[in-house]
Each structure stands twice: as C-alpha cells, then as structure tokens.
C-alpha cells in the first residue's frame, strides 16, 4: 500500500476508517431500509486520496457494516457479513469459454474477491454464439487475458489471477493452492478427471457441469465423494457427444454452477452432491438422480 508520504500504514488505515464513516449514507433497499452504503465514485476517490487498493477499500467498508452500493440488490438475500465472506473468497474457474466465461461474470457481479482463470486457448469466431466473454473484437485474443480485462472492468473490487495454460497433473496443485472452490468448465473428459483429482488433493469442492445441445448436467463433488468417475469411469473409452453447444444451455448451466459455488462459499443451502442434476431445455425437463452405492 502506498499512501500519502506523511502517513504510515497505521495512519492510512485510521484515515480510511474515518473517511468511510463520514462518506457512508443510508439507502432504501428492495425490502425497506438497507445498511449504510458507499458508492463507486467515493471508493475511487478514497483510492486516489489514500493510495489504498480498491479491493481493500471494499473489504474495509464491509468489515464496518457498510455495503458498497453495487451490492445493494444482493441484499437482503445476501447479508453484509456474507458479502464480506465472498469478498475474501478465492474461486478457480478452469475453462473460460461457454460455461467458464459466464461463471466468471456471475461471480464477479456477486463480489467473489479473488478469481483464478485457467485457459490456454484463444477466441474463435465459432465461440460467438454462446461464450459470454467473446466479441468480434476479442477474436484471436487469449480467453484468460480477456477474462481478466472484462472482470476487472466489471468489478474493480475483484482481483483476477490468470494462467493461460492447460491444467495438468504437474501444475494443478500450484493453481489450486489456497482456493476455496473450483469450477469444471472444460470440454475434455480427461482434463475433467485431472482437475477433479487436483481438487481432491487440495481438499476443496469441485462444481462440475457439461452441456450437449439442449442437455446439461450438474454435480458438486467434495474431496471424499466418488465424483466424476461414477459418470465417466477412467474416461479412456469415451468420446464427446456432438449435438452442438447452444447459448441457452451454456448460460443456464453456468449460472447453476455459480449458484453451487455460492452454496459452498457461504455454507448455505443443499449442494447437489452425490446426485446428478440433468436438464433438457427443449422439453423443459429437469431431474435429479442419485448414484447407487459402490
């Protein structure tokens, strides 16, 4: 942190606390009176005045029960203390295409403070039908770098780390270190199994999804769960289906993945665990089935 020359670190924190107390205002939420709030312009001004990083200002505000205005419509479904928990959470998204791009956007809007993006590929024109991060201007750009730029523009409180590489058995522990949850947004069965083994070794939950045409599937795998081997086995003799990748399916399943990640991070609800959720959007069908005990 680099603040004004005449202020040491302690003084900067004290000055920030006082500024936050002076700036916060009351706001009317969707269900009546909301917590005191602070807006983006005020946060940016504090950043320039005190030299405090913007993510740190968001965190300091939440610690004092002050809700950044951008999160007002998360409240009261997400409490201020839960918003603080999200701000200090670390999520890994492996794959930044049809599933991963939307997961990243949703998590950034929700306020997950640290996002790690893993994807070695570049955008192609055939991605434009469904991949939330792709535009004609992003063609040939790396998905990881594009994700970083989009997310940081969308929410400057989010810190983005990128790995424009393929996840492997050798690098997975480095990438997954200190994360709280990971998302499987891959399209290779073997890569999914490599990721799952990494999350088991790292001791964190994995939220899996896959799509094919109008069909999507979703499951959250905790380290002690049998997980994806119940679906794919070793994966050696399986070939991916080819009914296309539609935007409705990709965005639906991606947001369900983001919801599962939210459950994990906040310890809320009932994760779809040891159970597969399947959706067939054309017929409007949604089912859950449990796997038989091995």
Task: Please tell me what each predicted stretch does.
Residues 149-170:
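S-adenosyl-L-methionine
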Residues 103-104, 147, 195:
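Hydrophobic residues within alpha-helices
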